[in-house]
Amino acid sequence: MFIMNLLLYIIPILLAVAFLTLIERKVLGYMQFRKGPNVVGPYGLLQPFADAVKLFTKEPLHPLSSSVLMYTLAPTLALTLALTIWTPLPMPYSLVDLNLGLLFILALSSLSVYSILWSGWASNSKYPLAGALRAVAQTISYEVTLAIILLSIMMINGSFTLKNLIITQENMWLIVPAWPLAMMWFISTLAETNRAPFDLTEGESELVSGFNVEYTAGPFAMFFLAEYANIIIMNALTTMLFLGPSFNQDFTHVNTFTFMTKMMILTLTFLWVRASYPRFRYDQLMQLLWKNFLPMTLALCLWFISIPMALACVPPQI
C-alpha cells in the first residue's frame, strides 16, 4: 500500500513538471509576441510527451575521459532528491508526518549541491567544471539566507512541524508581519533553483550550457526534471511558510486546490521574472547575498527572537 501511495505521489509530480516546461515556453512566447509550441497536439499540449519520447529513446553517451559511475549517479541523485523532498509536505495530508519536516526539506535541498558538483567533476571537461563550481558557490551561499529565514519563521511558528504552520496562519498570513523575509525568501529561492536572473551556471555565452554540457538523452532529461521539480517544491514551501494554507476538515479537496492555486501563481511569477530581467554578474550575485541579504536576515531573526520575550508571550504550541 505504501508503494502505491508513493507512486500516486510521484506520477502527478512528474506530470506537473512536464506541463510546467510547456507553460514556461508558452508564457515566454506570449511575452515575446510569439506563439510558443503549437504543432504537437491541440495548442501544443502534447509537446512535453514528444520531448520525453525523444529524450528517453536516444542513446545516452558519455565522454571517453569521464568517470562513468559518478557521471551516471549525478542525475539519478538529483531526481531522487527532487522527488523525496515532497514527502513531508502537508497538502493537507503528508506522505510521512515528520516532527522536523522543515529541517528535512532544508537538508535535502542542500544535498542537491552534490549532484551538481559530481556532474561537473565527472564530465572531465572545463566548461562543466566551471559551471558546477559556480553553481555550488551560489547554492551554498543562498542556503545560509534560507536557513536564517526558516529559523525566523520557526520562532513565530513555535516548532519545525509543517502542520503547525497551518494553525499559526489561521487568522493572518505570515507574509503580512514578515514581508521583508518573504521578499528575501522569494529572491533566494530564485538563486537556489538557478533560475533567471541568477542562472549563472547556464550562461550560454560563457559556459555553453553549464554543468550539464556533456549530458545527453535520459540523464539530461533527469537533470531537467529535477530542476523543474525543485522550482515547484520551493514555491510549495513559500506557500506553506507565508501564504497560509487553509485547512477545513470537511473540504480537504478545496484545501488542496487553494494550495495548488497559490503555488501555481508563484511559479508563473518565476517565469515572469525570467522573461523580464537580464542575468546578474557574478560579483553582483554574491554582493546581493553577503552585503545585503545576510545582515538584514540576521537583524530580522534577532527581532523575531526578541519580540515574544519582550511581550512576555510564547509561540503557539501543539
UniProtKB/Swiss-Prot annotation:
> Which reactions fall under this protein's catalytic activity?
a ubiquinone + NADH + 5 H(+)(in) = a ubiquinol + NAD(+) + 4 H(+)(out)
Q: What is its EC number?
A: 7.1.1.2
Q: How does it sit in the membrane?
A: Multi-pass membrane protein
Report the record's Gene Ontology biological process terms: aerobic respiration
Cellular compartment(s): Mitochondrion inner membrane
Report a single Gene Ontology molecular function. Answer: NADH dehydrogenase (ubiquinone) activity
Please give the InterPro entries that the UniProt record associates with this protein: NADH_UbQ_OxRdtase_su1/FPO, NADH_UbQ_OxRdtase_su1_CS
Q: Which residues form a coiled coil?
A: none
Q: Which Pfam families match?
A: NADHdh
**Which Gene Ontology cellular component annotation is one that this UniProt entry carries?**
mitochondrial inner membrane
Instruction: Please give the chief subcellular localization of this protein.
Output: mitochondrion
Bilayer-crossing residues are 3-23, 68-88, 100-120, 136-156, 172-192, 223-243, 253-273, 293-313
Q: Which UniProt keywords apply?
A: Electron transport, Membrane, Mitochondrion, Mitochondrion inner membrane, NAD, Respiratory chain, Translocase, Transmembrane, Transmembrane helix, Transport, Ubiquinone
| Family note | Belongs to the complex I subunit 1 family.
Briefly, what is this protein's role? Core subunit of the mitochondrial membrane respiratory chain NADH dehydrogenase (Complex I) that is believed to belong to the minimal assembly required for catalysis. Complex I functions in the transfer of electrons from NADH to the respiratory chain. The immediate electron acceptor for the enzyme is believed to be ubiquinone.
Protein name stated in the entry: NADH-ubiquinone oxidoreductase chain 1
User: Where does this protein come from, organism-wise?
Assistant: Notoryctes typhlops (Southern marsupial mole)
